[in-house]
């Protein structure tokens, strides 16, 4: 597993899908300031890494969720990955909107889903876990069984881990924040001394003392 995590991290770094700004952090929609931004949409433009990622998602889904019947992508970043993996595995797929449409059938779930079907959610990354749990809840309210999530990257934040555990949702990510930081330092994408600041952020995102190397 460690080999896979490092291999995926190397792939993401090689296509510059991971950005590091410990001195001028990114601001998330939640208001959290982060030294790292992972744009997994760039995977779609890199065939070799895309094949690696989608094949790995297939492997973990087969291993962790052998009874899966449907794949559901999160809107919008998880849709393409769910479509590719669904094709590779011969499984139906759909996706869940952040809110229902205000026209047509006003669907929030796109694709055919029957009550009782076992669904795995495909997500590109997990931070605090809020958005992916919204998707899980929509699917469960529609009668689906959702044993878990397959994701490309996780920040490994305690808040996200606690939320998923409380909802009885398993997550299996291909790689994680600590591995990305370690590989990035070893391959000179970031200074080794910045790794501690990145981990400080991950451990307590509300504490901004890591910004600019402040203590």
Task: Go through each PLM region and give its residues.
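PRPP-associated nucleotide enzymes
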Residues: 1-122, 130-215
